[in-house]
């Protein structure tokens, strides 16, 4: 793990989103993470809604000086797809929060990503936990950023799907963008469904987080109660998976997951497989591995990280 004087600089690109909110809080409360910026994208809800939600989470987290920039409102080529059946009409249903006083910066998310990365020493990690539209657009607009991004830690993909039998939501929403990012040559670590479905908020987890007993933990518990209800109704899951926080947890301490370097390609043409991340688990293609694929989660360490971050946000 990094020492506190070696903070990992990150830009969180998100579509809040219940698990996005928890990911932001995890980063905000950890001394080894420096949030350089938060950028928003359409995904779980329209970008207008995800942007407001990001501002609300920043206020709970005390991120008053972190710029929040609104990004792409639709995929590169396809029609927009959102997930009100999981995240509610607001994109973050459940907790009742006042309108945020924090404002978006005027700069577009894509321009902000480009500016921050080019001005850096090559030490910024991108953490996209929604569709990859903003990241792909930044690479298209300014290819020089590719050599200056330290790493991209993606929540998305998997060896099975949750939007179609083949495709996970974040990749399916904008597979063309995902293909650009996965083929960029930038170091990529993928937190797919194989990993995130191990991050289940059980009743014991919720009880532990509730005992923190501050504004941030109360907010998280309310998120989990709503998220748990929709996951049970939609997928039959007894406990909701907290997908996006896995990406932040890895950035805090990579030992929280076990990874394997594998070949991953994004399908953009298939009639039944659009948006699939084809993970060459057994090396049958003979193609060069290009992604660190997370396969196993240290659940105790993961939830302890979240608890500790919430305690710091009191």
Language model: regions and residue ranges:
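Generic, well-ordered alpha-helical segments
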Residues: 46-50, 84, 105, 240, ...
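Short secondary-structure junction motifs
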Residues: 7, 63-65, 121, 261
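Conformational coupling and interaction surfaces
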Residues: 2-7, 25-27, 32-34, 172-174, ...
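Acidic/polar N-terminal loop/beta-strand segments that form early-domain functional surfaces
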Residues: 40-43, 71-73, 269
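A residue-level signal for conserved active-site and pocket-lining positions in enzyme catalytic cores
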Residues: 68, 181, 248
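A glycine-rich helix N-cap at a beta->alpha junction
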Residues: 57, 61-69
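Surface-exposed loop and adjacent secondary-structure segments within mature catalytic domains
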Residues: 69-97
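Active-site histidine-anchored catalytic micro-motif
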Residues: 2-14, 18-56, 90, 96-203
């Amino acid at each position: 793990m990094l020492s506190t004087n070696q903070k990992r600089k990150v830009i969180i690109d998100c579509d809040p989103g219940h698990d996005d909110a928890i990911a932001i809080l995890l980063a905000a409360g950890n001394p080894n993470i420096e949030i350089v910026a938060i950028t928003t994208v359409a995904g779980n809800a329209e970008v207008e809604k995800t942007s407001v939600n990001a501002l609300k989470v920043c206020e709970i987290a005390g991120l008053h000086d972190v710029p929040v920039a609104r990004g792409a409102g639709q995929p590169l080529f396809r029609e927009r797809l959102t997930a009100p059946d999981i995240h509610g009409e607001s994109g973050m249903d459940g907790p009742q929060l006042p309108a945020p006083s924090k404002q978006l910066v005027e700069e577009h998310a894509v321009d902000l990503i480009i500016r921050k990365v080019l001005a850096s020493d090559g030490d910024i990690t991108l953490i996209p936990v929604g569709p990859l539209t903003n990241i792909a657009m930044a690479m298209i607009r300014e290819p020089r950023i590719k050599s200056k991004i330290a790493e991209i830690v993606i929540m998305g993909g998997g060896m099975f799907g949750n939007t179609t039998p083949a495709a996970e939501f974040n990749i399916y929403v904008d597979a063309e963008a995902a293909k650009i990012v996965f083929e960029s040559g930038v170091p990529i670590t993928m937190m797919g469904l194989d990993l995130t479905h191990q991050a289940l908020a059980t009743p014991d987890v919720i009880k532990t987080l509730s005992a923190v007993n501050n504004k941030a933990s109360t907010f998280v518990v309310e998120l989990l109660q709503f998220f748990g209800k929709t996951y049970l109704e939609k997928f039959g899951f007894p406990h909701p998976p907290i997908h996006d926080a896995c990406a932040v947890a890895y950035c805090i301490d990579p030992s929280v997951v076990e990874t394997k370097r594998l070949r991953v390609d994004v399908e953009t043409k298939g009639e039944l497989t659009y948006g699939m991340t084809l993970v060459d688990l057994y090396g049958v293609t003979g193609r060069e591995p290009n992604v660190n694929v997370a396969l196993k989660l240290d659940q105790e360490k993961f939830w302890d990280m979240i608890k500790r971050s919430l305690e710091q946000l009191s």
